[in-house]
Each structure stands twice: as structure tokens, then as C-alpha cells.
Amino acid sequence: LIVRGGKYEKGIKEGRGKMKIINKGFRVLILTLILILPSSSIKAFNHENIDVKLIGHRGASAYEPENTIPSFVKAADLGMWGAECDLYSLRDGSLIIFHDNDVDRMTNGVGKIQSMSLVEVKALNIDSGNNIKKYKNLKIPTLDEYLICCKKNKLVPVIEFKDINVNNVKEVVDKIKGHGLEDESIIISTSYEWIKYIRQYSYKIQFQYLSDISLENINLLKEYGNYGIDVRKDRVTAENVRLAHENGAVVNVWDVKTEEEANMLIGIGVDMITSDYKLK
């Protein structure tokens, strides 16, 4: 598994519209080689036709508290290509990185996050997550803080829209552009409608629809270009990966937990794997 494929500056641009249809027999041969190589060799396996990007889910959340700056830095330290995060807008319109719709599970506070202001959110401390005892006064990051971290650590930003306002889209795109990350960034969502708003401000930011791979879903997105499907691991097959590639879509697979799962996905030709773990 190639965790950071090629030069960061090239980002996603080389992959756009250039999905390769790999000979099935060759794929089987490559998968066989991967399976017999020791795990320490898999991360260095870099054939020109196999360049699967590893994205840290909420950063490297198996090792650090999710959706925090330490988690994103850890993803970079582990050599991950990208860092996925979750985006909310607050009562005052501020944009912050957080997964849940309330702060109860992850912080020393209670309440719905969208009912809070940035000042109120920054007054909270994150008190849950892996290795949380290492940290005191760990804070919920803003979108700007996340983007600064990605830029500094050469991570591709992968931003899931959790609950934001349509009026926030331009601000999100402007912030991505302002940090010099427009060519590399990915926005994902369970609603395909967001691609229409994103395309008003950028054609360079890739949009990935969190859904199944189907011709129906592909047709919802295809006309807007630079798109993909973000699909759960148990919903992906060689056939629907081929369908996506034939229609110019990239395939990002999430909920991947083991090297065995990753090897299978490499074998059927997926483009990206999202995981809490460093998969060798």
C-alpha cells in the first residue's frame, strides 16, 4: 500500500480523468505478489499501476484523539497521504473540526455543538480518545487550524461536510484556496447536492459522494466532473470499481481495518483507502 504516492505537489491532479483499466490477469499477479511479500515490503510496493492512497480517518485516530491536531500530525508522521476530518458550522458561523452533533462524548462539556459559539467551543477541553492522558487542555480545532496543519505536514485535506450552511460553502472554498490547497483538497458528503454549490467556486476541489457505487449515483455527479464515490468496504466489488473508473470516478473505500482487507482492495483496483490505522 502506497501511503503517500508521488510528489505531494502533484496531489490529485495526476489522477483526474486518467483512471486506468488494468488487465485482470495482471491484477491477480500483482495481488499474489503483495500477499506473499512480508508486511514490511508492502508499503514500499510502487508499481506504476498500483498507487493506492492511504487516508487517515479523523487523522490517525487509532493512535491519538480523533479530529485533533495531534491526530493529524500523527497521520503525517506515519506517512499517510491524506487526513480526513469532519466539519460543522457553529451558531456564530465559525467552522470547526468535530464529528458528533454534541460535545458530550469527546469533551468535558455537554450540549449541541451547533448551538455554541467559537468562544464557547474553545473553552472546552477534549477529554476522550486514544492516548488522551498525554494531553492537557487539548482543543477542538478550527478549519483554518486543520488546513494549516495539512499544509505544514504535506497532507491532502479530506473534509467531510457534517452539518454546515449553504452560505458556508464559499467560505470553505476560499479558506482552502487561501492556504494554497485547492489543487489537493477533497470534500466528501452523504449528500450529492453539495457538488452543485462547490462547483460555483471551484472545479479543482474533488467531490466524493458517500454512498454506493451505482450508475444512478454516477449520473448524479458525472456532469460536474472531478468526482468520486466514497464507499464502505463491504459494498465494493471489482465490478463496481470498474464501473466507476469507466465513468471517470475515483473510488475511496472506508472502514478498512486490516492489511488483509487493504490487500484485497488493492487487488480490485480501488484508488484510496480510509482507515484509523497505518496499513503497511
Regions found by a protein language model. Give the residues of each.
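Short, Lys/Arg-enriched N-terminal segments with co-localized hydrophobic residues
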Residues: 1-18
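Phosphate-group recognition and catalysis centered on beta-loop-alpha active-site segments
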Residues: 4, 21-27, 34, 38-280
